A protein has these predicted regions:
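Outer-envelope beta-barrel architecture signal
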Residues: 42, 85, 103-107, 150-156, ...
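Short, glycine/acidic-rich beta->alpha junctions
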Residues: 70, 177-184, 188-192, 251-255, ...
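Outer-membrane beta-barrel proteins
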Residues: 92-100, 132-149, 192-196, 265-267, ...
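Short secondary-structure boundary/capping segments
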Residues: 126, 214-219, 344-347, 376-377, ...
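Outer-membrane beta-barrel transmembrane domain signature of Gram-negative proteins
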Residues: 129-150, 285-352, 480-540, 545
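Surface-exposed extracellular loop regions of Gram-negative outer-membrane beta-barrel proteins
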Residues: 149-198, 311-375, 441, 514-515, ...
Length: 667
């Protein structure tokens, strides 16, 4: 149990709104950081805003990044008083992993308060030295909790879903007949001990209820990254993290079952995962682009169908010295029915020779068996293998930061269970930056200047890109920021080398708790990848966040891109994302999402046939009631429409009704 009394000299300035869990980051909030293994490498974070809205995350001090996707089942409450606000937390020990011990526990602990006013302020019981790179090595130790009597650490989460989907072809054929499609599944999370956990799932519902944030993909040659949101993969996901992203579970699209074991014993951290996938999709990378492909099996009677594959993943990490690690990863995906397989083996290390310096290194080997469709579509040999090497040195102190990095990724390297969207290249980068910080009444609280040089060539030695960039980052009053970028590069594409120049300016501020506004402007001479020539791109991306009272939030973002070439405007693209949420309480909300994508092209300026105009419109209405992080009810409706040159208006092609209920039973 943890309680806070947060005094405030002006209670009217407290920023507190009702929101779904893990969305309180613009508010006042307070919480506790727990390094339960006392290894100064990984910690749990629990946060609560003044209205009791909760957030939780895992902080990885080795790789210096947090994971907000992790969710624990715990209770929180908060209230605003005449003196400030008060917060209480009840965190069950079964939600934490720690070393079993007959004697007292020793944990690293930090109590932190975020105090956003004219500037962002952080208050902690631990002074943090910016010249020391590690955070967890600087927090105090809490001793106690001797002779813990652990209860049965078991969660059984049954799932019930029903959907009713209508589709029709883009040629506007007849609608499919609607019908309810109920389904059931179950997740199990068993704490065998406090430091060893087994996750299992049977017939899981891995439907993604909430829409991904849209991304503009016009004049882009590489596959886009989307975050994982599914419960089975999120628990213990950080156990599989490495310097290079070799485990990207969004590639496991439609599993029928899954089994995962993760644990930590002393200096040893380990995890294994096995699953099947009813659909086999992965990234096929090249030096200048990538595509997502899905394997299919065809026969005369049923046509083409998705191919199942079996998946195995293993990870081991050994902690060394004060804050260093070495480890290994193995992944394997195979579909014997098609003669397909991809196996990856990796060794990695993160070394901290001083308090301010980090060396990260990872070597990977892959071997693939490629079925006929990969050989015909992508020119793959029957069997391929490749290597990958990544090395990076970073220095960060209170004033200076610099890095030197080198990548060497083989032409035939593939990580079909990871997110590796570029291969066949060698890359060198160096960056140096200087930061100034000011306290008191200075207009700018932080200024950073930096320069970056990088060079990329393919494995044959052909230069693909040479780039020089300069950065300016400033933070000022009203939580304002200004980020500027000026740079240029020599870029190779389709047999030609182009001189690119680019300028970018991002600005934003939050003058009151109810308003956040900003925009990014990017003006550049950049390659037109479709037609192999240089063009002028102007891109503007404004956004606004409005809060009406404590319950209603309005978020609108837009991206406008205009691309000109000799002869006129090649295309204009507009991408809008509107999300309006009424948060009844900290547990329930009603959200409306509207996403609109409009691309208009001058067909006479293209070398190949394109649509003159294409539009996509998706809408979703979603109600959610969350009892706990794992007990939740959804009900909603979504539809999708499109338009191309065949039609004069946007035409619907999908209508979906869905409902989902999950219940966390803890016997």
């Amino acid at each position: 149990y943890v309680a806070f009394i947060a005094s405030d000299p002006d209670v009217s300035q407290i920023r507190a709104f009702y929101s779904d869990r893990d969305l309180l980051w613009d508010d006042d909030f307070i919480g506790i950081v727990l390094d339960t293994f006392n290894d100064e490498r990984r910690a749990y974070e629990f946060w609560v805003n003044p209205l009791g809205v909760q957030a939780d995350s895992i902080y990885d001090d080795v790789n210096r990044r947090g994971d907000e996707s992790w969710n624990a089942i715990w209770d929180s409450a908060g209230r605003i008083t005449t003196e400030g606000y008060e917060v209480e937390m009840a965190i069950p020990l079964k939600q934490l992993r720690f070393s079993p011990s007959d004697s007292k526990q020793v944990w690293g602990v930090d109590f932190v308060r975020q105090f956003p006013r004219d500037r962002e302020n952080r208050i902690s019981n631990n002074p943090i030295d910016r010249d020391i790179l590690c955070y967890l090595c600087q927090i105090r130790k809490l001793e106690g909790l001797a002779d813990l009597q652990t209860s049965r650490n078991l969660e059984v989460i049954p799932m019930l879903t029903t959907t009713s989907v209508q589709n029709r072809s883009r040629s506007l054929g007849p609608w499919e007949k609607p019908g309810l499609d109920p389904d059931a599944g179950v997740d199990v999370r068993w704490g065998i001990t406090q430091d060893l956990y087994l996750n299992a799932t049977l017939n899981p519902d891995f439907s993604q209820v909430e829409a991904d944030a849209p991304q503009l993909d016009i004049n882009n040659t590489f596959s886009l990254f989307f975050p994982e949101r599914r419960t089975f993969f999120l628990d213990g996901a950080d156990y599989f993290d490495t310097f290079q992203n070799l485990v990207y579970t969004r590639n496991i699209a439609d599993p029928d079952y899954g089994l995962k074991l993760t644990g930590k014993s002393g200096r040893h951290t380990y995890g294994v995962l096995t699953a099947n996938d009813l659909s086999t999709s992965f990234i096929m990378p090249r030096s200048l682009g990538s595509n997502v492909t899905t394997l299919t099996l065809s026969n005369q009677d049923s046509g083409s169908r998705a191919v199942e594959s079996d998946i195995s993943i293993a990870r081991y990490r050994l902690d060394l010295f004060d804050n260093s690690t070495i480890g290994a990863v193995f992944t394997d995906r195979r579909a014997d029915a098609l003669g397909y397989s991809n196996s990856v083996a990796s060794i990695d290390a993160v070394l901290r020779p001083t308090n301010s310096d980090t060396v990260s290194i990872q070597g990977v080997y892959s071997r693939s068996e490629n079925p006929v469709q990969l050989r015909e579509r992508f020119g793959q040999a029957n069997e391929t293998s490749g290597n990958s090497l990544r090395v990076q040195y970073n220095h960060i102190d209170a004033e200076w930061d610099w890095r030197i990095g080198y990548d060497d990724i083989g032409k035939d390297f593939r990580a079909d269970l990871g997110f590796v969207n570029r291969v066949d290249y060698k890359y060198f980068v160096t960056t140096v930056g200087r930061t100034w910080r000011a306290d008191g009444d200075s207009f700018f609280s932080r200024i950073r200047l930096a320069a970056d040089y990088d060079r990329t060539e393919d494995q044959s030695g052909k230069e693909l890109e040479e780039e020089l960039e300069f950065f300016l980052n400033m933070n000022g009053p009203a939580q304002s920021y200004l980020n500027a970028l000026v740079g240029g590069s020599k870029t190779y594409w389709n047999g030609k080398t182009f001189d690119e120049q680019y300028n970018q300016l991002s600005m934003g501020f939050s003058p009151t708790a109810n308003l956040g506004i900003g925009a990014t402007l990017r003006i550049e001479d950049v390659v037109d990848f479709t037609n192999t020539r240089l063009g002028r791109s102007n891109r503007l991306g404004p956004f606004i966040r409005l809060q009406f009272g404590r319950h209603l939030q309005f978020n609108l973002s837009h991206t406008l891109q205009q691309f000109d070439v000799d002869g006129g405007r090649l295309f204009t693209a507009n991408l809008s994302d509107l999300r309006t949420t009424y948060q009844f309480t900290a547990k329930s909300f009603l959200r409306f999402t509207l996403q609109y994508n409009d691309r208009e092209r001058d067909q006479s300026l293209y070398l190949s046939s394109v649509q003159r105009r294409s539009k996509d419109l998706t809408a979703q209405l979603l109600y959610s009631y969350r009892f706990t992080a794992a007990t939740r009810f959804f009900i909603g409706y979504s539809d999708a429409s499109f338009q191309d040159d065949r039609f004069d208006s946007i035409e619907p092609i999908n209508r979906s009704f869905f409902a989902k209920f999950t219940y966390a039973w803890q016997p």
